[in-house]
Curated annotation (Swiss-Prot):
The gene is MED7B. Belongs to the Mediator complex subunit 7 family. Residues 1-33 are annotated as: Disordered. InterPro entries: Med7/Med21-like, Mediatior_Med7, Mediatior_Med7_sf. Component of the Mediator complex, a coactivator involved in the regulated transcription of nearly all RNA polymerase II-dependent genes. Mediator functions as a bridge to convey information from gene-specific regulatory proteins to the basal RNA polymerase II transcription machinery. The Mediator complex, having a compact conformation in its free form, is recruited to promoters by direct interactions with regulatory proteins and serves for the assembly of a functional pre-initiation complex with RNA polymerase II and the general transcription factors. One of its GO terms (biological process) is regulation of unidimensional cell growth. The keyword Ribosomal protein does not apply. It comes from Arabidopsis thaliana. This is Mediator of RNA polymerase II transcription subunit 7b. GO terms for cellular component: mediator complex.
Length: 168
């Protein structure tokens, strides 16, 4: 009795046997989803928009200024977070029943930190792409220079070979 390692392919694979000769034999892929959709019970949207803290029900701890100094605000929130964690340690030692308020404040600070960091992601992605493209340009220039150098070496070797052959 022989057993197969893999199960047999589904019967509809025969519908696409001539795909290499005729690309129209396969059905077109479904169009991309636009708007909202449900996946594993969660509602998602295809729009890449960062919801505001107010929409999420979180108080905003930094100014709503359009010219926000991200570095300054991140440092400020980080210092505030450190202070609240130390206060939480004091509360847990002295008044353990009041820890819930401190946990809520720490959670709010973390959410503000993450919101600020997430708002920087498009800038970081753009800077990363610029860096990658600059590296690619540099590598291509280096490759061109390497090809030119090797071509000159090959031409020199050919000239030497012609001189040697002509001298004999």
């Amino acid at each position: 009795m022989a057993t197969a390692t893999y199960p047999p392919p589904p019967p509809y694979y025969r519908l696409y046997k001539d795909f290499s000769e005729n690309t129209d034999s396969a059905p077109e892929p479904p169009p991309p989803i636009e708007g909202t959709y449900v996946c594993f019970g969660g509602n998602y949207t295809t729009e890449d928009v960062l919801p505001s803290l107010e929409e999420q029900g979180v108080p905003q701890l930094y100014p709503k200024d359009s010219n926000l100094d991200y570095k300054k605000e991140l440092r400020s929130l980080n210092r505030e977070l450190q202070l609240h964690i130390l206060e939480l340690a004091d509360v847990l030692v002295d008044r353990p029943s009041q820890y819930a308020k401190r946990i809520g404040e720490i959670s709010s600070i973390f959410k503000n930190l993450h919101h600020l960091l997430n708002s920087l992601r498009p800038h970081q992605a753009r800077a990363t792409l610029i860096h990658i493209m600059e590296l690619q340009i540099q590598q291509r220039k280096q490759a061109v220079e390497d090809i030119k150098r090797r071509r000159e070496e090959a031409q020199g070797l050919l000239k030497d070979a012609f001189v040697t052959l002509d001298g004999q």
